[in-house]
UniProtKB/Swiss-Prot annotation:
May form a heterooligomeric complex that consists of seven subunits: mnhA1, mnhB1, mnhC1, mnhD1, mnhE1, mnhF1 and mnhG1. Coiled coil: none annotated. Belongs to the CPA3 antiporters (TC 2.A.63) subunit A family. The chain crosses the membrane at residues 1-21, 30-50, 79-99, 117-137, 166-186, 206-226, 228-250, 265-285, 300-320, 337-357, 373-393, 427-447, 472-492, 522-542, 591-611, 623-643, 646-666, 671-691, 707-727, 764-784. It is found in: Cell membrane. This is Na(+)/H(+) antiporter subunit A1. One of its GO terms (cellular component) is plasma membrane. It comes from Staphylococcus epidermidis (strain ATCC 35984 / DSM 28319 / BCRC 17069 / CCUG 31568 / BM 3577 / RP62A).
Length: 801
C-alpha cells in the first residue's frame, strides 16, 4: 500500500477512532485531536505540486478484485491535486472554525466522525482511477453529508433537508452508475485513464449519447444545477461548519470534478458543449435571481453557491469547444478551462469565508433573518471588514480574486459568439447575454448582503441575543480565507504555474497552456460588460424594494419544491395501493403472481430465443426408476384429493421418501440420507403442529380457484422440465466436475467431494446458511420463552386473586 493510499484512508481510519476517543477526552474539545489530520494531508499534497508542475503524474495501484476489474487505483494529476488541496486545506480551516462554533456539550464524537468520513470519501472521489471505486466513494459522500446535514436531528427542517439531499444525489449517483457500466462495456475496463485513451471507441459506441446523458444527470444532481438545485437551500439547516465545507468547497464541487474529468471523452459531442454551457448559464441566472429575494443569510449564500456553480459549469462547457479546433483557436477556448479552474479556487475562498462569517453572526445575534439584522457595523467591525472584502470578490469587484475570474468568464462567453460551430455564430449571442444578466443579479445580492447586516438601524429588541463580535477561534479561519482573496487577486501568478495550468492541462489534454490574469488589460468587451454590470446593478439596488416584490409574489405552486413535496406525499400512497393490489396477505395469491410471471418469462424466452433440446445422450428409463416416479405421481395426486390432513401429511412424506430413493438410484447417498432425515423431521413437526391446531374442515373451492392452481402447477412443472432439458442440451462450457475431481484432495485435503464442496469451495455460502438457521432457531426460542413467561405471569395473577 502506497503513501497515497494511506492519505485517502487516513480520514476514514480516524473516523472510526474518534467516537471512542471522545469518551476519554471530554474536558478538551475533540476538534483539537481532529485538526492534525487535514493539516498533515494538506502538507503532503502540497509536496506533490512540484511533480505536477513538471508535467508528471502519479498512478498507484492496489489490487482488490482484479478478476472483475475493481482495483483500488489512485491517480494524481493537476486536476486531482487541485481538489485534494481544496478538500484538505478548507477542511483544516473548517475543523479549526468548528472548535469555536460547537460547544463541548454537542455530540462531537458523531460530528467529527461524519466530517472525517466525508473528507476521506471526497479524496477517494477525486483521486480514484477506477470508476467503480469512484462511485463507491461518490455514494459515501452522499451518505456522510446526509449525516452531517441532519446532525441537529431534533429539528424537522434538518431531517427534511438531509432526506432531500440524499434522495436527489443518490438518484443522480445511480444514473452515473448506469453510465459507468455502459462505458465499461464499450472499453472493457473501469480505469478512467484507460477510458480516456479509448475515447474514439466510446464515441463510436451506440450507447454514446445515453452514457453522456447519464453522466450529466449524475454531475448536475451533485453540483445542484437546474432543475436539481432544490436540495442545496434546504441543506443549509446543517451546522455552519458543514455548510462552509460541503457547500462551498467540496461536495457541490464533485459534480464539477466529474464533468472536468470526463470532458476528454465527451467534449467531441456538440450536445455536450451546448448542454453543459446552457445548463450552467441557466443555473447562474435563475439562482442569482432567487438569491435577491431571500430573507435568511444562509439562504442567500445557498442560492449564491448554486449560481456560482452554474457559472463554473458553463465555463467547462465553453472550454470543451477547444476539442473542436487545433492550434491558436484551440488555445483561445482552453481559456474557458483556465477560468473555471481559477474560479473554482476563488469561490472556495470567498464563499467559505462568507459561510463562516454568517455562522459567527448567527452565533453572536441568535438569528440569520435579514429583517431582524442591521446596524452591526460598529458592533462587529472585524466581521464587517471580512464581509466587505469577500462579498466584493463574489460580486466581481477589483482588486479581489473574484474580479479576475469573472473577467475571464465574460471574455470566454464573448469569444464563443465568433464560433462557426453548432450555430454558435447565430445563437451564441444568447450566451454572453445570459452571463451578463446573471452577473448583474450576482452584484445585487452581494452588495445587498452587506447592507442587510451592517447598515440600517440596529434593532436590539428583535435579536434573541445581545450582539457582539465573534470569538477569535471563529475569526481565524475566515481571516485566512479573506487574506487569500486579496493575495490571489493581487498576485494570481502564485497559482498559475503551480495549480491552474497543471489542472487545465489535465482537462484539456493539451500542453503549453499559459494562464495570465491582469487587473486591467485594456478597454475590451469583457471590461465594458463589467462596467455595465456595475451600473445596472447599482440602479437595481436603488429600486430594489419595488421589483423584489414581483419575485416574492411568485406562487409556490409553480416551484420545483412544490412538485418535489407533492411527489413525496403522493408517491407513497400510489405505491401502497399498487402493492396492496397484488400483495393480499394470502401466501397462495402471492405465489400465483410470482410463479405465473416466472412461467410467462420462461415460455417467452423459450419461444423468442432458439434453443436445441437433445435427447441423444439422455439415459434410458429403468424399470425401478419408472416405478418410483409412478409412485411419486400417485402420492402427489392423493395429496390433492385427500379429505384428511393426516392423510395429506403422510402422502407428502411419501413424496419426499420417493425422491430420496431416486437419489439412491442416481448414486447420491449423501443427498438421499439428508432428504430422508429432513422428511422424517418435517413429518414429525407437521404432526406435532396439527395436534395443537383446531380441527378445520376442508371447504369447497371455486372452479376458477382449482383451475388456477392446476395451471400454475402444470406450468411450473413444464418450466422446470424444459429448462432442465435446455440446460442439458446446451452446454457451452466444460463440466466443473473435472475441476473438483482434480483439486478436491490437493487443495482441500478431503476425499468426499460433496463434503469438500460444501465446507471449502462453498464454505462462505454454507456459513451463511448456518447463520440463517441459527437466526431462525433464536426466533423460535424467543417465541417459546415469551409464551412461557406469559403463562407464568397469568398463573401468578390467578394465584394472587
Amino acid at each position: 500500500m502506497s503513501l497515497l493510499h494511506i492519505a485517502v484512508l487516513l480520514p476514514l481510519i480516524f473516523a472510526l477512532i474518534i467516537p471512542f476517543l471522545y469518551r476519554f477526552v471530554k474536558r478538551i474539545h475533540l476538534g483539537w485531536f481532529v485538526l492534525p489530520v487535514p493539516i498533515v494531508l494538506f502538507i503532503y499534497f502540497i509536496s506533490l505540486i512540484s511533480m505536477t508542475m513538471s508535467g508528471n503524474n502519479v498512478m498507484k495501484n492496489l489490487n482488490w478484485m482484479p478478476h472483475i476489474g475493481m482495483n483500488f487505483n489512485l491517480y494524481v494529476d493537476g486536476l486531482g491535486l487541485l481538489f485534494s488541496l481544496l478538500i484538505t486545506g478548507i477542511g483544516s480551516l473548517v475543523v479549526l472554525y468548528s472548535i469555536g462554533y460547537l460547544s463541548k456539550s454537542e455530540q462531537l464524537g458523531n460530528f467529527y466522525c461524519y466530517l472525517l468520513l466525508f473528507m476521506g470519501a471526497m479524496l477517494g472521489v477525486v483521486l480514484s482511477d477506477n470508476f467503480i471505486i469512484l462511485y463507491l466513494f461518490w455514494e459515501l459522500t452522499s451518505f456522510s453529508s446526509f449525516l452531517l446535514i441532519s446532525f441537529w436531528r431534533e429539528k424537522k427542517a434538518s431531517i427534511y433537508g438531509a432526506q432531500k439531499s440524499l434522495i436527489i444525489t443518490v438518484l443522480g449517483g445511480l444514473s452515473m452508475l448506469g453510465g459507468i457500466i455502459l462505458l465499461s462495456l464499450a472499453t472493457d475496463t473501469f480505469s478512467i485513464q484507460a477510458m480516456i485513451s479509448k475515447a474514439s471507441d466510446i464515441q463510436n459506441s451506440p450507447f454514446f449519447i445515453l452514457v453522456m446523458i447519464l453522466f450529466m444527470i449524475g454531475a448536475f444532481t451533485k453540483s445542484a444545477q437546474v432543475p436539481f438545485y432544490i436540495w442545496l437551500p434546504d441543506a443549509m439547516e446543517a451546522p455552519t461548519p458543514v455548510s462552509a465545507y460541503l457547500h462551498s468547497a467540496t461536495m457541490v464541487k464533485a459534480g464539477l470534478y466529474l464533468i472536468a474529468r470526463i470532458t476528454p471523452i465527451f467534449a467531441i459531442s456538440e450536445g455536450w458543449v451546448w448542454t453543459i454551457t446552457l445548463v450552467g448559464l441557466i443555473t447562474l441566472f435563475w439562482a442569482s435571481l432567487n438569491a435577491t429575494k431571500q430573507h435568511d443569510l444562509k439562504g442567500i449564500l445557498a442560492f449564491s453557491t448554486v449560481s456560482q456553480l452554474g457559472m463554473i459549469m458553463s465555463m467547462l462547457g465553453i472550454g470543451a469547444v477547444s476539442y473542436h479546433y487545433q492550434g491558436a483557436n484551440s488555445q483561445l477556448y482552453v481559456a474557458g478551462f483556465v477560468a473555471a479552474i481559477f474560479h473554482l479556487i476563488n469561490h472556495a475562498t470567498f464563499k467559505g469565508a462568507l459561510f463562516m462569517i454568517t455562522g459567527g453572526i448567527d452565533h453572536s445575534t441568535g438569528t440569520r433573518d435579514v429583517k431582524k439584522l442591521g446596524g452591526l457595523l460598529t458592533i462587529m467591525p472585524i466581521s464587517f471588514t471580512l464581509t466587505v472584502i469577500t462579498t466584493l470578490s463574489m460580486a466581481g469587484v477589483p482588486p479581489f480574486n473574484g474580479f479576475l475570474s469573472k473577467e475571464k468568464f465574460l471574455e470566454s462567453m464573448i469569444n464563443v459568439t465568433h464560433l462557426n460551430l453548432m450555430s454558435l455564430n447565430t445563437l451564441g449571442i444568447l450566451l454572453p447575454i445570459i452571463a451578463i444578466i446573471g452577473s448583474i443579479f450576482t452584484f445585487v445580492y452581494s452588495i445587498k448582503f452587506i447592507l442587510h447586516i451592517f447598515f440600517g438601524s440596529y434593532k436590539p429588541e428583535a435579536l434573541p441575543k445581545q450582539a457582539h463580535e465573534s470569538s477569535i477561534l471563529m475569526l481565524i479561519s475566515p481571516i485566512i480565507l479573506t487574506s487569500l482573496v486579496i493575495v490571489f487577486g493581487l498576485f494570481p501568478s502564485i497559482l498559475t504555474q503551480s495549480i491552474i495550468e497543471p489542472a487545465s492541462v489535465a482537462v484539456s489534454q493539451t500542453s503549453n497552456i499559459t494562464a495570465e490574469f491582469h487587473l486591467f488589460h485594456g478597454i475590451t468587451p469583457a471590461f465594458l460588460s463589467t462596467i455595465g454590470i456595475y451600473i445596472i446593478g447599482i440602479l437595481l439596488l436603488i429600486s430594489f424594494s419595488y421589483w423584489v416584490r414581483l419575485l416574492q409574489a411568485h406562487p409556490y405552486q409553480l416551484t420545483l419544491n412544490h412538485w418535489y413535496d407533492t411527489s413525496g406525499q403522493r408517491i407513497p400512497g400510489y405505491s401502497e395501493n399498487i402493492t396492496n393490489s397484488y400483495v393480499t396477505g394470502f401466501s397462495r395469491n402471492n405465489l400465483v403472481i410470482i410463479l405465473g410471471i416466472l412461467i410467462a418469462l420462461t415460455f417467452v424466452t423459450v419461444i423468442s430465443v432458439p434453443f436445441s433440446i437433445d435427447f441423444k445422450n439422455v439415459s434410458h428409463l429403468r424399470v425401478f426408476e419408472g416405478a418410483t416416479v409412478l409412485f411419486l405421481l400417485i402420492a402427489s395426486t392423493f395429496i390433492i384429493f385427500a379429505k384428511s390432513r393426516l392423510f395429506s401429511i403422510i402422502m407428502l412424506s411419501a413424496v419426499g421418501y420417493a425422491i430420496s430413493v431416486l437419489f439412491i438410484f442416481f448414486k447420491a447417498p449423501d443427498l438421499a440420507l439428508t432428504q430422508f432425515v429432513v422428511e422424517s423431521i418435517s413429518t414429525a413437526l407437521f404432526l406435532l403442529c396439527f395436534y395443537h391446531l383446531p380441527n378445520l374442515n376442508r371447504y369447497n373451492e371455486k372452479p376458477t380457484f382449482k383451475l388456477t392452481n392446476a395451471v400454475i402447477s402444470i406450468g411450473v412443472g413444464l418450466s422446470v422440465i424444459i429448462l432442465g432439458l435446455i440446460g442439458y442440451g446446451n452446454r457451452h462450457f466444460d463440466s466443473i466436475t473435472k475441476f473438483y475431481q482434480e483439486h478436491v484432495f490437493d487443495l482441500a485435503h478431503g476425499k468426499n467431494m460433496v463434503n469438500v464442496i460444501l465446507v471449502d469451495f462453498r464454505g462462505m455460502d454454507t456459513l451463511f446458511e448456518s447463520s440463517v438457521l441459527g437466526i431462525a432457531g433464536l426466533g423460535v426460542y424467543t417465541m417459546i420463552k415469551l409464551r412461557l413467561k406469559q403463562k407464568n405471569q397469568s398463573s401468578e395473577v390467578n394465584d394472587h386473586e
